[in-house]
């Protein structure tokens, strides 16, 4: 089958990073981020448009300056379990930290979601960006990069091993023979590694898709390496056309170097299309959004999040950007380094850095339905992504994309007209993962 575009929906409730004014939008309920009906409604819309997945991001540290959605939101797997009962094909991808969760708990929770959804679960593996998270888990300091990413790799390996505890035909449930489970097809893990000692087995069988799909949002060097080693889906940062192409080429090269098939990893860039009947109407809408979000104090606070939730309000705004590189040593290092490089290279003050940090270039996917479809197709065919992780301002902005752009992509033969599978893995075009113990048994029998 020819290559087709994949789409995910990323809801931000009352407003994520940079969306300072969204909670004031009269069309957005003030409790949207904790209203399960909000998520169910969006999930049904996404499924009606044949999207691949609903993606729920998460973090576990806040202060009062954080984005509105972050201040009051639902835990991802609880949320997705509820959504699962109202959908039948839409993938359900949740973010959980490998730094602050044990592999056995991760394996059990995601396997449970995979069963509840009948094979539509995905785990977005993160190592936790906010350094303050450590203090919510009894640690004085956030773990350093090498430790966090080493732990993340081992965590995924352990979790996947636990997901293979039962072979796919381990439960004959043969009443006549009195055999519920075949003990030869139940396997302990007995993992002993640098970060974890996990015996297993997991008390939960494999799902219709074998196991949940592993996602990762690799931006740093360590993140890209981890993504290349284990990810089956990657949430890429987006940016310009050239930046996206460079990231895509780099990550696909790394996947191949890791001995994996690059076509079996779906790369989705973050994107917020602005669609209206004409290009000019879309530009007006984009200007409205920019005006709604214009808030210097909030932009300054958002800048602080890139440096460990640092409070920049106590500095002289018109002095040179302060020396704060050390504050991002264990979290958000790549983004912080880019900010510092620009500040030093252009001799910017703190005020200028905050203003530049809040700048929004014109969205690459902006205009009439045909214009937006043209841009998406150009990026896709040029090797900038396999799909887009979409975020929209409100229901109207989502409806413009669903009702006008999706049909345009379908007419061009680049987006599905029906789901290919009942599972997330199947809709992403990923192969079914054979149970490692079944594979080992097959190899022994073939000798």
Cite the ranges covered by each PLM segment.
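Hydrophobic or amphipathic alpha-helical targeting/insertion segments
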Residues: 86-137, 143-146, 151-155
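N-terminal beta1-alpha1-beta2 module of alpha/beta enzyme domains
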Residues: 1-86, 209-212, 440-447
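Hydrophobic faces of well-ordered beta-strands that scaffold small-molecule active sites
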Residues: 5-9, 54-56, 90-96, 119-125, ...
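Conserved, mostly hydrophobic/aromatic
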Residues: 7, 46, 50, 83, ...
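Acidic (Asp/Glu)-rich catalytic clusters
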Residues: 2, 44-48, 80-88, 114-120, ...
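Active-site mouth loops of central-metabolism enzymes
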Residues: 22-37, 95-104, 140-142, 208-221, ...
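Alpha-helix-loop-beta-strand connector modules within alpha/beta enzyme cores
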Residues: 67-93, 256-258, 401-417
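An alpha-helical appendage that flanks or caps ligand/catalytic pockets
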Residues: 1-18, 27, 146-209, 242-245, ...
